[in-house]
């Protein structure tokens, strides 16, 4: 057992938890030792992480001033500099709230008329009206 712990490859893993030994022990892992993992987790900053196929976690590196957005084209300067919030849309809605509500009411009324014509025909033939 001691001949395995004397190898340089397993030296940084002596105090690592068992679950991390496989990810940290690979030669192409992004963490060279367990101290880097402790420093990155104790920094107190919220970071995003990617995972490699081997299970090692690496912090995503974004250029300063840029953020990850799911858009197909570049944003204008005022939109790009505004902080992201889940309750603020990036663009103004195209339809006003009044138009949207009236559209729903008209759709419900039209649906009721379309359904009532076959029902009225069926019941008029059934009761000879």
Swiss-Prot record:
The keyword Cytoplasm does not apply. Keywords: Electron transport, Heme, Iron, Membrane, Metal-binding, Mitochondrion, Mitochondrion inner membrane, Transit peptide, Transmembrane, Transmembrane helix, Transport, Tricarboxylic acid cycle. It is found in: Mitochondrion inner membrane. Residues 1-58 form a transit peptide. One of its GO terms (cellular component) is respiratory chain complex II (succinate dehydrogenase). This is Succinate dehydrogenase subunit 3-2, mitochondrial. Residues 27-53 have a biased composition (Polar residues). Pfam families: Sdh_cyt. Heme binds at residue 87. Membrane-anchoring subunit of succinate dehydrogenase (SDH). It is a single-pass membrane protein. Component of complex II composed of eight subunits in plants: four classical SDH subunits SDH1, SDH2, SDH3 and SDH4 (a flavoprotein (FP), an iron-sulfur protein (IP), and a cytochrome b composed of a large and a small subunit.), as well as four subunits unknown in mitochondria from bacteria and heterotrophic eukaryotes. One of its GO terms (molecular function) is electron transfer activity. Pathway: Carbohydrate metabolism; tricarboxylic acid cycle. The chain crosses the membrane at residues 105-127. Signal peptide: none annotated. The gene is SDH3-2. Its cofactor is heme. Residues 27-66 are annotated as: Disordered. The keyword Electron transport applies. GO terms for biological process: mitochondrial electron transport, succinate to ubiquinone; tricarboxylic acid cycle. It comes from Oryza sativa subsp. japonica (Rice).
